[in-house]
């Protein structure tokens, strides 16, 4: 295609490192990572890229989002031996091949050392909740319906306890073949935003997250909001390092990867 040219230079000198910012609706995907269980964001994007570039590529992502989780600002990269001279045309061509629930928002040439995971300094996730008795159908695929009164003041108090550096073992689900060297993570900020139609957005920003940590924090905040847990329970939950002490895991469909910071 006319926006790429095959270089005559050696592989090491001709390799370009391309960073993509992508957004996707997670409903149809079994998460970011390739899996025999069903379609993944990674495989869908890889297939379209290889169709354009005409060579095998490997993708790395800032976050391996779970099945059903959405993204507004996922960052991925790939190496190519093609010289992509017109990034805007490249984006248009790639989007024309991709399903409409997966979009390329931007593309950028990066230094060879750039890695979307290793160079990431923080990620921000947004989780949406509707606590009205009846949820509008348009919100159903993208927010957790909790049709009961919530004590927002108590939830805000709990947030202040969770911010900072802690051992978040109690907020980590077990995952086969995933072993952490430690469970200490730093939550930089949590904001509770009240939206229209009795909806909430919980924004959580941190340097790194454990498996399902964000969704378990949200589930715990909901338990506090409905009075099933108390604000005073948070320190003992953290100290327990016991997943059963914290709240329920919030469902995947309310979660968005919002921003990745470098």
From Swiss-Prot:
Active site: 66
Binding site for substrate: 125
Catalyzed chemical reaction(s): uridine(38/39/40) in tRNA = pseudouridine(38/39/40) in tRNA
GO-annotated molecular function: RNA binding; tRNA pseudouridine(38-40) synthase activity
Record-linked SUPFAM superfamilies: Pseudouridine synthase
CDD domains the UniProt entry points to: PseudoU_synth_EcTruA (cd02570)
A Pfam family recorded for this sequence: PseudoU_synth_1
Protein keywords: Isomerase, tRNA processing
EC number from the UniProt entry: 5.4.99.12
Gene3D superfamilies in UniProt: Pseudouridine synthase I, catalytic domain, C-terminal subdomain (3.30.70.660), Pseudouridine synthase I, catalytic domain, N-terminal subdomain (3.30.70.580)
GO biological process assignments: tRNA pseudouridine synthesis
Family of the protein in this entry: Belongs to the tRNA pseudouridine synthase TruA family.
Biological role: Formation of pseudouridine at positions 38, 39 and 40 in the anticodon stem and loop of transfer RNAs.
NCBIfam families on file: hisT_truA
Subunit structure and binding partners: Homodimer.
Name of the protein: tRNA pseudouridine synthase A 2
The organism of origin for this protein: Protochlamydia amoebophila (strain UWE25)
